[in-house]
Amino acid sequence: MQKTKILRKLMGAVLCAGMLVGLAGSMSVTAQAALKTVNISAVYGKTKIINDLKTVPIVSSETKISFSKTSKGIKFKSQQEGLVKFKADGKNYRVLVIPDNLPKNNFKFGLLKCKNGVYYTEQKDKLDSWVTVYNSNDYDVDVTYTHSDYKDKSTLFESRKYTEKALAPGESYTFFVYSCMPDSKNSVSVTKSKYQSVLENDVYTAVGTFNQLQTSFDCINNTNDKITVKISYAKLDKNGKINSCGETEDVVLPANSRQNYTILNYGFCPSNVKIVDFHAYITK
């Protein structure tokens, strides 16, 4: 069974809004708009060398970020998470400082975004899209992933929403959707959850059988509550990388039950489907 390792360490809420630290002095609106923006990421509490940065930015002594000059570039280090902004060498720098225990294999750091304490990254493969989210808050959150297909760059064809309830602290999850059009956009919204997440050890799920037409899942609920299990599954290549054809499904399990569920693949899924991720919450 393939699934993301869940790290249960509680963390403080991420300051997604970030803070602006920059050079003293004023600049015109026109001049600001002309500056090139550089987007990079760094890990909380660890040194990041910014190679193309030659000048040490001037920052307030009250900030939790530091810079030092080396022969290879400027060393950056932050003791705060979230988005850090500063200006230097005629450029706008935006550094997304991510938690040290983010499951790094599931995220492309250069594409990372953050909203209300949830980090997420999106990928596409032809008409397949998937968004992996990670909750760095110290409370359960509901994450809504909206996928919009466009007939062209500006004409909306349809939008579909998928809500993942009670994503636990330190938990990551992968949404999948099959696009109807070549042009599509993804967005994520986050709210504090009214649901209660279920610990990983209380739930078991695995791929039972699979073929071109359908996939069956074996699921066990060891809790005294009725729960909903969210399953993300996809084709993986020989290196374990997501290749194509992903789906996300809801499975409701009665208390203390063992169930087998069969889900149609609509004929386009290959026959080496594996579970990429799953998590569960108490059903209201």
Predicted regions and their residues:
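Sec-dependent signal peptide cleavage junction
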Residues: V21-K36
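Solvent-exposed, low-complexity, repeat-rich "mucin-like" stalks and linkers
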Residues: A34-S60, E171
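Intrinsically disordered, low-complexity Pro/Gly/Ser/Thr-rich segments with frequent PxxP/GP/PP motifs
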Residues: I40-A42, T155-D183, I242-C269
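A short beta-strand micro-motif common to beta-rich folds, especially ectodomain repeats
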Residues: Q80-G90, V229-I231
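Low-complexity, acidic Ser/Thr/Pro/Gly-rich terminal tails and inter-domain linkers that flank the onset
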Residues: N101-K126, V190-L213
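Asparagine-centered strand-capping/turn motif at beta-strand->loop junctions
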Residues: T132-Y139, C219-T223
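Terminal connector regions
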Residues: E171-T215, Y266-K284
